């Protein structure tokens, strides 16, 4: 008996990082010391106070029961209070917050929940590859807006053709940005709200790296912008802020209709997140240890960025100096595609990087570096690459 995949399943894109991981693992199995800068998996432990919060929550018998379908009210209130404190945004915890088992779930669900097959969505190029999963599952039409170095990797809304803007139903934006490390300004978000209102386009702000701003920069929330809740939502994950990537905890906040649609689809897919994890999330948000721990984490990532970029510049390898996230967006030398360059680095220097083309056609002149190893290993990676003589030192 055969069990062929459905037509819908056959439209799903291949997992970009799966192929990269396979290549890296093959080299490691062959006995090579690979410096893996290709992935975006936080390397630091979850803050101790959150671990203790989970231990206590796991021992409460009530947390062994099913969670409430739309999440624990106490957790949603903590999320609303956090946004009020950090960004001055007032949220109704029951109507304007949706609990998610990781922000990826919300990003992939949204086209199912709020779009019809054939509707148009605008995605940034380059952008987070898993946005494409939602495009495929929602059977929607994809248009892209390029993120260009000359515009600090922010979309220029004039680059979106009038006919595309008029038919688009949603646009996804992600700042601080994966893969470029670019950050958004309040002025940019004001332009975004104006664009959304002019063309009746819903905005989805992926704020995964919101806490990670370098050189003293505090990343503004899209929802801080006047009129933002009229046109969109923002997704906030605990993965990067609190080193909780494996815990799968996030929330969406903002426009009531969009939040209700996400809640409704989740009623049919999940029974929310393990209650003890939600309780630990409350501890993460409310503890007086929160801000000092986050500040130490940001300083760590910034020191890694500086170590890597400074070493790279010395060998003639140029970067867009990231204003946030834990990535560096590096140029590819002439004569190579991003995939060819990544293969050379892995095979000859035993350094793994993510080819920019994996994030979109506009990313092909770059590779993404994950700043998720020690400064010493980052500098060692540059030293290995220097021996390949691929760059012209200035």
Feature annotation, model-predicted:
Residues 27-30, 138, 198-199, 315, ...:
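Helix C-cap/helix->beta junction micro-motif
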Residues 282, 299-309, 319-331, 363:
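Conserved glycine-rich beta-strand-loop-beta hairpin in the small C-terminal domain of fold type I
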Residues 119, 140, 198-201, 229-230:
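A short helix->loop->beta-strand "cap" motif at the edges of active sites that frequently abuts
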Residues 59, 63-194, 211-212, 219-223:
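Conserved core of the PLP fold type I
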Residues 81, 335, 344-354, 359-394:
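PLP-dependent enzyme catalytic core of the Aspartate aminotransferase-like
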Residues 2-101, 109, 284-287, 391-394:
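N-terminal small-domain helix-loop-helix segment of the aminotransferase-like
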Residues 224-299, 306, 310, 389-390:
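Conserved core segment of the aminotransferase class I/II
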